[in-house]
């Protein structure tokens, strides 16, 4: 079989090492130049490669598509017009694991926000119960890296991965929440929502369980399963003090992150999912209470001169940033917005900040978008993060919280949200 890796990011890079051990003919195609290191590697292993998606892609039997490649791209057009079979690294790896290990249980986590935290927390709980657990997917570790002999596979799944996968079906699908996002990639909001729904529908049709945020159920086309006991919903109504109540079970949460509104749904989804996997309340409690937030997800970086610095660089959309800032209502906080907007309505975020923030500092591409809305005197505009920190040194007082939850993609000034987060941390140390 002629297999073409379309795009050569982390996931396809990892998959290539496995494919080289197969009898397939492997090509690599992407729309930009390869690094010299990549080219040396390809030549050493007799792998044909091309830029600008031409003959190699057109003549393959199977295209393994990097998730970020949009459906209106040149590569997608070639795939669709030539009726080339397609898949993703995630789906291809899942199929291979299932062939070798039919008892493997897959938990797929999707949603607009909280995917990475929920994936990490479910994985953290399951590792307490069973060390033979893999945690990865869109969160950063490709499934191709996993051994085929594990019991649990906890994978974050993006809407892009769902779009390019035809059959990937976890035993349990988890939907953290839904809000407008990636409208520069998907056709429209309904297309984005129904792409997310596909993962849940596949699980339900195969006899599996869908764990769904109660607020999102009506936004999805799940009518045929609405009354099904296999749709399990969770909501903040399940919280009583520092307890989560689910059916006849109670989980006591003493982790400080439970005090922040933004993490509550992630913890609820994780507790409900693992309870339905038969994990004991005691293990779930121990795991939740020892869990630490992911890097750049409303992470407390430092308390310095009476000021707390929170890094939420991973907040690349309005919904995520809104929920982060909402967690600081009633406290003195300074908000920092930046990045490239995603065709979203900023109104709820702007109104939240106008009402509750002490000051709002905006830099980067976000400035043009923010200035389209009615603002008040709290909004200040700077050219870069260094200028932001100079201004912070003038206005910060004891008891303030500096919250960097940008609400936009990082690509205006940074390679990714991690690089943006690292820059913020560096400036906190220097300040």
Curated annotation (Swiss-Prot):
Its EC number is 6.3.2.9. InterPro entries: Mur-like_cat_sf, Mur_ligase_C, Mur_ligase_C_dom_sf, Mur_ligase_cen, MurD. The keyword Cell wall biogenesis/degradation applies. It is an enzyme of class 6 (ligase). Keywords: ATP-binding, Cell cycle, Cell division, Cell shape, Cell wall biogenesis/degradation, Cytoplasm, Ligase, Nucleotide-binding, Peptidoglycan synthesis. Gene3D superfamilies: Mur ligase, C-terminal domain, Mur-like, catalytic domain, NAD(P)-binding Rossmann-like Domain. SUPFAM superfamilies: MurCD N-terminal domain, MurD-like peptide ligases, catalytic domain, MurD-like peptide ligases, peptide-binding domain. ATP binds at residues 111-117. GO terms for biological process: cell division; cell wall organization; peptidoglycan biosynthetic process; regulation of cell shape. Its main location: cytoplasm. Pathway: Cell wall biogenesis; peptidoglycan biosynthesis. It catalyses: UDP-N-acetyl-alpha-D-muramoyl-L-alanine + D-glutamate + ATP = UDP-N-acetyl-alpha-D-muramoyl-L-alanyl-D-glutamate + ADP + phosphate + H(+). One of its GO terms (molecular function) is ATP binding. Belongs to the MurCDEF family. Cell wall formation. Catalyzes the addition of glutamate to the nucleotide precursor UDP-N-acetylmuramoyl-L-alanine (UMA). HAMAP family: MurD (MF_00639). This is UDP-N-acetylmuramoylalanine--D-glutamate ligase.
């Amino acid at each position: 079989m002629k297999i073409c890796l379309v795009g050569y990011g982390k996931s396809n890079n990892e998959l290539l090492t496995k494919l080289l051990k197969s009898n397939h003919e492997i090509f690599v195609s992407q729309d930009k130049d390869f690094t010299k290191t990549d080219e040396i590697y390809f030549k050493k292993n007799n792998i044909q490669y091309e830029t600008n998606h031409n003959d190699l892609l057109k003549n393959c039997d199977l295209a393994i598509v990097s998730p970020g490649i949009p459906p209106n791209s040149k590569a997608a057009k070639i795939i669709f017009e030539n009726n080339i079979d397609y898949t993703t690294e995630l789906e291809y790896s899942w199929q291979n694991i299932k062939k070798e290990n039919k008892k493997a249980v897959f938990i797929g986590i999707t949603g607009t926000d909280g995917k990475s935290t929920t994936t990490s927390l479910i994985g953290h709980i399951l590792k307490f119960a069973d060390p033979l657990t893999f945690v990865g997917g869109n969160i950063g570790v490709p499934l191709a890296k996993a051994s085929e002999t594990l019991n649990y596979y906890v994978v974050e799944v993006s809407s892009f991965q769902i779009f390019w996968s035809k059959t990937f079906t976890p035993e349990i699908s988890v939907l953290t929440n839904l809000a407008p996002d990636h409208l520069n990639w998907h056709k429209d909001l309904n297309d984005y929502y129904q792409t997310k729904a596909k993962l849940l529908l596949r699980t339900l049709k195969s006899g599996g369980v869908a764990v769904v945020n109660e607020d999102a159920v009506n936004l999805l086309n799940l009518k045929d399963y609405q009354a099904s006991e296999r749709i399990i919903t969770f909501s903040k109504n399940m919280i009583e003090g520092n307890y989560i109540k689910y059916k006849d079970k109670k989980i006591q949460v003493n982790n400080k992150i439970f005090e922040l509104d933004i993490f509550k749904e992630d913890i609820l989804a994780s507790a409900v999912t693992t309870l339905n996997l038969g994990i004991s309340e005691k293990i779930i409690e121990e795991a939740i209470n020892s869990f630490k937030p992911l890097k750049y997800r409303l992470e407390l970086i430092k308390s310095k001169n009476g000021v707390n610095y929170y890094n939420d660089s991973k907040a690349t959309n309005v919904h995520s940033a809104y929920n982060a800032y909402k967690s600081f209502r009633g406290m003195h906080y300074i908000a920092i917005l930046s990045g490239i907007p995603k065709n979203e309505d900023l109104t709820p975020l702007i109104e939240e900040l106008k009402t509750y923030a002490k000051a709002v500092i905006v830099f980067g591409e976000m400035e043009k978008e923010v200035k389209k809305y009615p603002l008040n005197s709290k909004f200040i505009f700077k050219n870069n993060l260094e200028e932001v920190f100079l201004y912070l040194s003038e206005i910060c007082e004891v008891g303030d919280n500096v919250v960097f939850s940008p609400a936009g993609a990082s690509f205006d000034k940074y390679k990714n949200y991690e690089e943006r987060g690292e820059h913020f941390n560096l400036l906190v140390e220097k300040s």
